[in-house]
């Protein structure tokens, strides 16, 4: 049977959900092919969304019309702001989720979205003519025609599950791997490599002894992810903290020879920042204990996920390890931990739209691009979906810059640098992180969302009004010069604030940590009518004014630099500071400007700085 649509999405994980929903929302006829409809939106690993860097991604996806934020707000079990005591740039919202509620909410959203159809089958091969996508074939002899195809297969491409010495061809425990499509992608000449990730054991909630374990609560004023969420008052459950101990470590050491990670059974590289427990014991042998979090998987507390205990050790060893841990002495394992090895395509094969350079109309998103994490997958799925629709309409692509969004950082890192290990987002990856805070996501991306038709006009008008009020009042505060007069000193004293000794402007005064929103309204009467969202932005802009201005200067400098032309016949060889790889790529592609050079995979900002300097030096000489 032959069926037609505008866009095909292959895979119903977090990337596939966002890609299919956003494309349908933008008016395309979308068909989602997934192996099991019941597993759409399944959280395969930890029962949580968000965190440091990841919370930023989730909120950016939300503002740009994505679903992850609203699904999380409707399925969370505990909400917290991580790094709450630190500056706003490095804070991150995180939620424990009810995995069943999340999956059901996501699945129903997909199944009830106009312009979006779903079928349960396995994609086996791509149909390509003249290096352009035409469609796909499936395992039940269906042919789907579409000009745009988005592959979001997660860990299913040639997936192999490892538990001790045992191996099974699975894309997830108990589910078939996608071997035909994996072979097809290799035959098409893509640079295919292997990665590894893992998951932790789960235990029955009624078999845990919680007495004596440290209880971990959610925030009293729980944060939420979606700007559309109203009247947020979730039921929150506690997590619990326990630790491994020297006995645990000895059990693991005694079984290193049976660990797939060390026996040579696993070839793929695992996530650096989420190592297995056996890897931690091996690498950090001096540590006497490692922290573990017991996280409820559902509101019923029937199962707990042991966060921090990712493992692929044999079943009998997993039993001994778990029973050596305080609170888990009599725990019943409901699901064992395992490692999974899978194919991914080097993301340097992609443009910034996530379209492959090799085949027009083919987009990749999620773990197939070498990333790890639900949030990273969702962000890529969203951007692939948006760009596939824009390409169908012959409109300009939507590419976020590194100074606009963490999504921009994520995609730029992937397509220019590639990866040899599962890529995870952190705030430290963003050089402009002071501008890319969670609290200003709406202000950063609202304009884009509205332009793309992904934000309602009334809300957008209110947002623009808020932005104007922020700018106007910051200008007024800068122009407001205060002197240490009797009246000023008296008012500061009434607010329990230290006196000023010299002239200061309003921005400098509000930069004080102690000057909260209530004091702001009290001291500057013109701030009194402003809503809390506007006041909060004014406060943050004042506090980090010097650093924010510096980052804006750096952005302007970079934008100016990228406009610099590279002289015809320019010799790249012999320039100190340029790696051999950079020289080879520059000689091969012969960019006409620094902007064109910046688009070449493997060319770093440091390379551009060096090039800029030597272009200038050679012109002057």
UniProtKB/Swiss-Prot annotation:
Annotated binding of NAD(+), by residue:
270-284
Q: What is its main location?
A: cytoplasm
What cofactor(s) does the depicted protein rely on?
FAD
What family is this protein classified in? Answer: Belongs to the MnmG family.
Record key words, sorted: Cytoplasm, FAD, Flavoprotein, NAD, tRNA processing
Q: How does it assemble?
A: Homodimer. Heterotetramer of two MnmE and two MnmG subunits.
- Source organism per entry reads Helicobacter pylori (strain Shi470)
GO CC terms on record? cytosol
Pfam families per UniProt: GIDA, GIDA_C_1st, SAM_GIDA_C
What is the protein's known function?
A: NAD-binding protein involved in the addition of a carboxymethylaminomethyl (cmnm) group at the wobble position (U34) of certain tRNAs, forming tRNA-cmnm(5)s(2)U34.
What's the protein here called?
tRNA uridine 5-carboxymethylaminomethyl modification enzyme MnmG
């Amino acid at each position: 049977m032959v069926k037609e649509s505008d866009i095909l999405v292959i895979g119903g994980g977090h990337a596939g959900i966002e890609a299919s929903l956003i494309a349908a929302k933008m008016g395309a006829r979308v068909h989602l092919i997934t192996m099991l409809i019941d597993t759409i939106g399944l959280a395969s690993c930890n029962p949580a969304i968000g965190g440091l860097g990841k919370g930023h991604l989730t909120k950016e996806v939300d503002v740009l019309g994505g679903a992850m934020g609203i699904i999380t707000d409707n399925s969370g079990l505990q909400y917290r702001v991580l790094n709450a005591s630190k500056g706003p740039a490095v804070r991150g919202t995180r939620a424990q989720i009810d995995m069943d509620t999340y999956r059901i909410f996501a699945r129903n959203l997909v199944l009830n979205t106009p312009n979006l159809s779903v079928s349960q089958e396995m994609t086996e091969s791509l149909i390509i003519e003249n290096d352009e996508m035409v469609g796909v074939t499936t395992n039940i002899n269906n042919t789907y025609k579409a000009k745009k195809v988005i592959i979001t297969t997660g860990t299913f491409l040639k997936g192999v599950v490892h538990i001790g010495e045992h191996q099974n061809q699975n894309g997830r425990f108990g589910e078939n791997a996608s071997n035909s499509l994996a072979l097809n992608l290799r035959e098409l000449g893509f640079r295919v490599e292997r990665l590894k990730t893992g998951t932790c054991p789960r235990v029955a909630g009624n078999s845990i002894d919680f007495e004596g374990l440290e209880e971990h609560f959610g925030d009293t004023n729980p944060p939420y992810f979606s700007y559309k969420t109203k009247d947020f008052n979730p039921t929150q459950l506690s997590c619990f903290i326990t630790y491994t101990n020297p006995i645990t470590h000895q059990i693991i050491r005694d079984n290193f020879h049976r660990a797939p990670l060390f026996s040579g059974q696993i070839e793929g590289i695992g996530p650096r920042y989420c190592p297995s427990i056996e890897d931690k014991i091996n690498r950090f042998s001096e540590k006497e204990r490692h922290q573990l979090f017991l996280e409820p998987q559902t509101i019923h507390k029937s199962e707990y996920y042991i966060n921090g205990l990712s493992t692929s050790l044999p079943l009998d060893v997993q039993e001994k390890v778990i029973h050596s841990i305080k609170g888990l002495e009599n725990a019943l394992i409901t699901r064992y931990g395992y490692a999974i090895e899978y194919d991914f395509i080097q993301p340097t094969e992609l443009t910034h739209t996530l379209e492959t350079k090799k085949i027009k109309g083919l987009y990749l998103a999620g773990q197939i691009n070498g990333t790890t994490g639900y949030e990273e997958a969702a962000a890529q799925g969203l951007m692939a979906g948006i760009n596939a629709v824009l390409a169908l309409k012959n409109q300009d692509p939507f590419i976020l810059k590194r100074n606009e969004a963490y999504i921009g950082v994520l995609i730029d890192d992937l397509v220019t640098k590639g990866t040899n290990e599962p890529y995870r987002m952190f705030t430290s990856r963003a050089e402009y992180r002071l501008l890319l805070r969670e609290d200003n996501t709406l202000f950063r991306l609202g304009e884009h969302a509205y332009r793309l038709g992904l934000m309602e006009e009334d809300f957008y008008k209110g947002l623009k009004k808020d932005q104007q009020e922020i700018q106007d009042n910051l200008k007024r505060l800068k122009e407001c010069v205060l002197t240490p007069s009797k009246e000023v000193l008296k008012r500061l004293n009434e607010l329990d604030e230290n006196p000023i000794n010299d002239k200061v402007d309003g921005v400098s005064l509000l930069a004080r940590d102690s000057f909260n929103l209530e004091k702001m309204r009290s001291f500057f009467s013109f701030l009194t009518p402003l809503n809390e969202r506007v006041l909060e932005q004014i406060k943050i802009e004042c506090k980090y004014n010097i650093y924010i201005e510096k980052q804006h200067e750096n952005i302007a400098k970079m934008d100016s630099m990228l406009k610099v032309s590279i002289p015809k016949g320019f010799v790249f060889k012999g320039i100190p500071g340029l790696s051999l790889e950079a020289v080879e790529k520059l000689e091969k592609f012969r960019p006409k400007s620094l902007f064109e050079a910046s688009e070449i995979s493997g060319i770093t900002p440091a390379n551009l700085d060096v090039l800029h300097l030597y272009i200038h030096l050679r012109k002057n000489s």
